[in-house]
Amino acid sequence: MKILATETKLGRRVQSGGCAIHCQNCSISQLCIPFTLNQHELDQLDNIIERKKPIQKSQVLFKAGDELTSLYAIRSGTIKSYTISETGEEQITSFHLPGDLVGFDAIMNMQHPSFAQALETAMVCEIPFDILDDLSGKMPKLRQQIMRLMSNEIKSDQEMILLLSKMNAEERLAAFIYNLSQRYSARGFSAREFRLTMTRGDIGNYLGLTVETISRLLGRFQKLGVLSVQGKYITINNMAELIELSGTNKNKIQLII
């Protein structure tokens, strides 16, 4: 899978999808399971992966309570993870980008505790968990990479707890935008110009803020000259000031990619 870039009317580099056959041809493989594997190991991994048809916007990949049968590596698009409370309220827990693996939180009980839903048309690689588990026992590099990815997810959860407990509203949104810019940069896209694939409502839900607060803060950031907003497109004009607004240095939080 190659992540391609297209030019919009606004001249921004936007994520889009194109198909490829093997893991070694995937432009985000360094962020995914294939990283560090040799050719023979890549071939073994390739043999168990099912490259699914496009998942349409709003389509659910799996639901809370579903049995864990596979992990899903995102090839293109964005997927959100969320839970639903007893009162029917949705709580977003993660936004997954290309290179991320979805489904790790189901390993303990072999049952998904959350939902995964596409925020836009997405492509995923389905990796049968039982076969992957067996392969990882035979391939130390594969096992190490899975452990690295799981550790990364745990650290991300810890940073989110710190963000919500230590930061005010302005710092939360600034940290979110900065973290998103770094994640896009790691995937070969511009760190300064990108499209928000999630709604302001989704961002507010994730950060524990209202839609009105998100809109007000985006307006404030624009007035300060930190960033420009045009619809879903964000342009970061002053990265240093954005980092300062995020309070990551003050709170000693290192947001992960």
Swiss-Prot record:
Gene3D superfamilies: Jelly Rolls, Winged helix-like DNA-binding domain superfamily/Winged helix DNA-binding domain
Residues covered by region (Essential for the oxygen-regulated activity): 23-32
Induction entry: By anaerobiosis.
UniProt KW keywords: 4Fe-4S, Activator, DNA-binding, Iron, Iron-sulfur, Metal-binding, Transcription, Transcription regulation, Virulence
Transmembrane segments: none
Comment on bound cofactor: Binds 1 [4Fe-4S] cluster per subunit.
Top-level taxon of the source organism: Bacteria
Key word 4Fe-4S present: yes
GO CC annotation: cytosol
DNA-binding region: 200-219
Annotated residues for binding of [4Fe-4S] cluster: C23, C26, C32, C125
Names of the cofactor(s): [4Fe-4S] cluster
Molecular function per GO: 4 iron, 4 sulfur cluster binding; DNA binding; DNA-binding transcription factor activity; metal ion binding
Listed InterPro entries: cNMP-bd_dom, cNMP-bd_dom_sf, Env_Response_Regulators, HTH_CRP, RmlC-like_jellyroll, Tscrpt_reg_HTH_Crp-type_CS, WH-like_DNA-bd_sf, WH_DNA-bd_sf
HTH crp-type domain mapped to chain residues: 167-240
Function according to Swiss-Prot or TrEMBL: It is involved in the activation of genes necessary for anaerobic respiration. It probably also activates genes involved in the production of virulence factors.
Subunit composition and interactions: Homodimer.
Protein name: Anaerobic regulatory protein
